[in-house]
């Protein structure tokens, strides 16, 4: 029988509920329990796939092809449990399914309402796919009081009544602000947030109080008195120097022990946190440092590249070095040629990440050219690989080489994928069709040249599986021209039609991949491509 932990937030958004859920899941896992974490997103989009990165941040893609919230990346990185489509639901998807059923006549003429139809759909999602789990953690997006989240709160209230006693627990994340002028922490926002939650029929069992300054015992007792919880259930959550120290910090404050106590578990095994100790030791005690430039389009919001940022950190952990990331707007290079050398020369590695659209593309191509000519370690991901191929084609004499994503071109080195193979068979897409859910999404296999640099990076593997999210693909018709210029196709789809990896054997480290390796990197198991890239950057740092 799985136990359920419902995680809500109050006072303000962006308190770190996702990180808290991931940390608690990791702590329970360290005690030997099987856990899975799910995310309820109240927005009306069916999924975040068509949302602006500036609005939503990164779209995290699962093995089974779901476009999900970036918090699922935290869940997977902290627990090592692969996220899947059934771990994320939105109001948009709930309503889409309900309206489709109504149109089919599945409700037999009944009036379709928020209660019971919407709340039942949410409950069914929460209860599905238990897989002999010990704990299922459910994070509810947004803030208590948001009108969009009311059906989710009602579904939680019903579940807490319907499930067995001590089978559910509510954790509420709040803010205890510090008023500098008064020199005081203020508990009133937390009190009001708990009162708002209680008005919806949900009494929190544990309060996680985010604060900039230590929470004195007197303030903890005050919160406990006014919010009707034990003092030990008021857990301070101070700002941490690294997200990878958060699980250890929460354990020190007694979060996991208090949660287990809420379920009546008093004899739980002690947690094995040695892996977390090793990660934090490597993070806080590096033996060197490198500087990596990320030349992208959405650098104004680093959450747009959340998994990429973390994967670079993981590469640093693998090599025991600190990774300094410089976020560079690719458009700068289109406006000022002198900026290219000024911004790129100090770097030990250049990375061009995935993205969409023409804006900044010429700046990215200029970055590829700089890395190729100056022999600086280069890593191109998704669109970054496509830019590397366009740059290579231009160098090979195809001056008009471009992508059909950017408009009509006489030299379509990159074009839209019209069909590709999935486990279910051939999947097709028409240009001009719907954007949502129509990309090549999820895990696909690739075959590697056993004599290639990339195969060596993967430990000699000739077959790999990586996650994809793209509509456009390098045109294999240009393979001979590109390989003649030195850009080798070292990885292809199993049917040999879709290029997956390119590399330059005459370069210290030049790799482009069509997939997103950052989505599978973890602090305990850094992705080999990021480990190799940072290792090459470390070597470069010793040359300059």
UniProtKB/Swiss-Prot annotation:
InterPro entries, alphabetized: Class_I_gatase-like (IPR029062), CTP_synthase (IPR004468), CTP_synthase_N (IPR017456), GATASE (IPR017926), GATase1_CTP_Synthase (IPR033828), P-loop_NTPase (IPR027417)
Binding residues annotated for L-glutamine, in chain numbering: 54, 355, 383-386, 405, 471
Catalytic reactions on record: UTP + L-glutamine + ATP + H2O = CTP + L-glutamate + ADP + phosphate + 2 H(+); L-glutamine + H2O = L-glutamate + NH4(+); UTP + NH4(+) + ATP = CTP + ADP + phosphate + 2 H(+)
Region (Amidoligase domain): 1-265
Pfam families tied to this protein: CTP_synth_N, GATase
Tagged with keyword Transmembrane helix: no
Active site: 382, 516, 518
Keyword hit for Ligase: yes
Residues noted as binding CTP in the record, renumbered to the chain: 13, 146-148, 186-191, 222
Activity control: Allosterically activated by GTP, when glutamine is the substrate; GTP has no effect on the reaction when ammonia is the substrate. The allosteric effector GTP functions by stabilizing the protein conformation that binds the tetrahedral intermediate(s) formed during glutamine hydrolysis. Inhibited by the product CTP, via allosteric rather than competitive inhibition.
Keyword vocabulary terms for this entry: ATP-binding, Glutamine amidotransferase, Ligase, Magnesium, Metal-binding, Nucleotide-binding, Pyrimidine biosynthesis
Enzyme Commission number(s): 6.3.4.2
Note: CTPSs have evolved a hybrid strategy for distinguishing between UTP and CTP. The overlapping regions of the product feedback inhibitory and substrate sites recognize a common feature in both compounds, the triphosphate moiety. To differentiate isosteric substrate and product pyrimidine rings, an additional pocket far from the expected kinase/ligase catalytic site, specifically recognizes the cytosine and ribose portions of the product inhibitor.
Family: Belongs to the CTP synthase family.
Protein name: CTP synthase
Organism from which the protein derives: Erythrobacter litoralis (strain HTCC2594)
Gene: pyrG
């Amino acid at each position: 029988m799985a136990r359920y932990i419902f995680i809500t937030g109050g006072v303000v958004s962006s308190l770190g509920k996702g990180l808290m859920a991931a940390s608690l899941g990791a702590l329970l896992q360290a005690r030997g329990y099987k856990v899975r974490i799910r995310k309820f997103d109240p927005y009306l989009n069916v999924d975040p796939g068509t949302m602006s990165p500036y609005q939503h941040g990164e779209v995290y893609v699962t093995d089974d092809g779901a476009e999900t919230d970036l918090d699922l990346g935290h869940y997977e990185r902290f627990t090592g449990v692969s996220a899947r489509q059934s771990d994320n639901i939105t109001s948009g998807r709930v309503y889409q399914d309900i309206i489709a059923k109504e149109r089919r006549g599945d409700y037999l003429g009944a009036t379709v309402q928020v209660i019971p139809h919407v709340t039942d759909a949410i409950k069914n999602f929460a209860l599905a796919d238990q897989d002999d789990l010990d704990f299922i953690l459910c994070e509810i997006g947004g803030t208590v009081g948001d009108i969009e989240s009311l059906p989710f709160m009602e579904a939680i209230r019903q579940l807490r009544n319907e499930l067995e006693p001590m089978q559910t627990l509510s954790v509420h994340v709040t803010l205890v602000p510090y008023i500098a002028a008064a020199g005081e922490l203020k508990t009133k926002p937390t009190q009001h947030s708990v009162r708002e939650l209680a008005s919806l029929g949900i009494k929190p069992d544990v309060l996680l109080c985010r604060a900039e300054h230590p929470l004195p015992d007197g303030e903890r007792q005050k919160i406990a008195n006014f919010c009707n919880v034990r003092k030990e259930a008021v857990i301070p959550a101070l700002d941490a120097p690294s997200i990878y120290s958060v699980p250890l910090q929460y354990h020190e404050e007694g979060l996991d022990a208090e949660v287990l106590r809420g379920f009546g578990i008093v004899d739980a095994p002690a947690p094995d946190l040695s892996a977390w100790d090793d990660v934090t030791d490597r993070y806080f005690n590096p033996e060197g440092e490198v500087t990596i430039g990320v030349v992208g389009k959405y650098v104004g919001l680093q959450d747009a590249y959340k998994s990429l940022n973390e994967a670079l950190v993981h590469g640093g952990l693998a090599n025991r070095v600190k990774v300094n990331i410089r976020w560079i707007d690719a458009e700068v290079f289109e406006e000022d040629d002198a900026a290219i050398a000024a911004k790129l020369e100090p770097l030990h590695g250049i990375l061009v990440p995935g993205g969409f659209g023409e804006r900044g593309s010429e700046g990215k191509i200029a970055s590829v050219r700089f890395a190729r000519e100056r022999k600086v370690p280069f890593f191109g991901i998704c669109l970054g690989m496509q830019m590397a191929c366009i740059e290579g084609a231009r160098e090979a004499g195809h001056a008009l080489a471009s992508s059909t994503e950017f408009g009509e071109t006489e030299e379509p080195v990159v074009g839209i994928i019209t069909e590709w193979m999935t486990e279910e068979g051939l999947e097709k897409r028409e240009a001009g069709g719907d954007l949502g859910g129509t990309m090549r999404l999820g895990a696909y296999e690739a075959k590697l040249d056993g004599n290639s640099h990339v195969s060596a990076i993967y430990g000699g593997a000739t077959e790999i599986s990586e996650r994809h999210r793209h509509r456009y693909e390098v045109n294999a018709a240009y393979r001979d021209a590109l390989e003649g210029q030195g850009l080798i196709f070292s990885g292809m789809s199993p049917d040999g039609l879709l290029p997956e990896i390119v590399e330059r054997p005459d370069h210290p480290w030049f790799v482009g991949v069509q997939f997103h390796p950052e989505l599978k990197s973890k602090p305990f198991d850094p992705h080999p491509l990021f480990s190799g890239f940072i290792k090459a950057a470390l070597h470069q740092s010793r040359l300059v």
